[in-house]
């Protein structure tokens, strides 16, 4: 009797890694309901809560990222890396997967490295337009590399690359909420132009500061705003709003659980340039002003943003210029129907509609080949 299909999925750290990982897992289960899926994440990171909430088991590794500013701290990081590799090896030995998938984030390095060394076929998903260091190292042993942008042969062997796009949260693809209903759900006025402000799942200091320091501009704008601050910024955000007086045109929250409603409500979005978020904007045809984070490896968010800007599919403001320009540009743009229409049309051309299923099918091919060769 053939064993159930077993797949390890590793990575996390931010929603930009976790949401695609869960989408891939869901696609695997839809096509193979009997499949057993085990996630491997980093202890203390967001995936340790989000993955179980999505219905999947997860094991944690004590892995941490390298500190590029304080090299002495990396002594403990190296110790954790070695410990994580040994633990990943034990997890793989016990679970006996037929394939392993890496989606980026701290845990994917030791997990995929050990899987490759143990003869397990590996697939990595590179979400950004500029490949990260970990994925560039893992790519040498990977069987397949799923990417979201053209031109990734700069980083990876051409024969391994499959252009799939980035999987997005499942609820976004199947939402049926109208703009009017969505806006009312945030206590706002459907007759007014609405700007959604997000900074990724962890929040964004620069974007939040722009809003807190620009509450007078928001009052006078004639538009209305849905503002997701991130949990660590919500206290000071609410204090700033309370001090500014009555702001009926502003809905502020630390986290939006129903992003389908938030996107439906938005005529324009202000966001960081994480790969997962950009994939969602493309799929939903949303005009966006991107403010790339300067605090990411290889400045990959700027490269993500420019990939859209060069196709007239998004607007772009540097982090350093945001304080002076961001809110003014947003209010100006949301009042220009032709600009919004053009941005929407162009960003829609970059959408991939079935990424998770395409990636799942590649995982099945690797697993099937492994099972035939190993009698499992």
Swiss-Prot record:
InterPro entries: GlcNAc_MurG (IPR006009), Glyco_trans_28_C (IPR007235), GlycoTrans_28_N (IPR004276). It comes from the Bacteria. Pathway: Cell wall biogenesis; peptidoglycan biosynthesis. It is found in: Cell inner membrane. UDP-N-acetyl-alpha-D-glucosamine binds at residues 14-16, 128, 169, 201, 256, 301. SUPFAM superfamilies: UDP-Glycosyltransferase/glycogen phosphorylase. It is an enzyme of class 2 (transferase). It catalyses: di-trans,octa-cis-undecaprenyl diphospho-N-acetyl-alpha-D-muramoyl-L-alanyl-D-glutamyl-meso-2,6-diaminopimeloyl-D-alanyl-D-alanine + UDP-N-acetyl-alpha-D-glucosamine = di-trans,octa-cis-undecaprenyl diphospho-[N-acetyl-alpha-D-glucosaminyl-(1->4)]-N-acetyl-alpha-D-muramoyl-L-alanyl-D-glutamyl-meso-2,6-diaminopimeloyl-D-alanyl-D-alanine + UDP + H(+). Its EC number is 2.4.1.227. GO terms for molecular function: UDP-N-acetyl-D-glucosamine:N-acetylmuramoyl-L-alanyl-D-glutamyl-meso-2,6-diaminopimelyl-D-alanyl-D-alanine-diphosphoundecaprenol 4-beta-N-acetylglucosaminlytransferase activity; undecaprenyldiphospho-muramoylpentapeptide beta-N-acetylglucosaminyltransferase activity. Keywords: Cell cycle, Cell division, Cell inner membrane, Cell membrane, Cell shape, Cell wall biogenesis/degradation, Glycosyltransferase, Membrane, Peptidoglycan synthesis, Transferase. GO terms for cellular component: plasma membrane. GO terms for biological process: carbohydrate metabolic process; cell division; cell wall organization; lipid glycosylation; peptidoglycan biosynthetic process; regulation of cell shape. Coiled coil: none annotated. It is a peripheral membrane protein. HAMAP family: MurG (MF_00033). Cell wall formation. Catalyzes the transfer of a GlcNAc subunit on undecaprenyl-pyrophosphoryl-MurNAc-pentapeptide (lipid intermediate I) to form undecaprenyl-pyrophosphoryl-MurNAc-(pentapeptide)GlcNAc (lipid intermediate II). Belongs to the glycosyltransferase 28 family. MurG subfamily. This is UDP-N-acetylglucosamine--N-acetylmuramyl-(pentapeptide) pyrophosphoryl-undecaprenol N-acetylglucosamine transferase. It comes from Phocaeicola vulgatus (strain ATCC 8482 / DSM 1447 / JCM 5826 / CCUG 4940 / NBRC 14291 / NCTC 11154) (Bacteroides vulgatus).
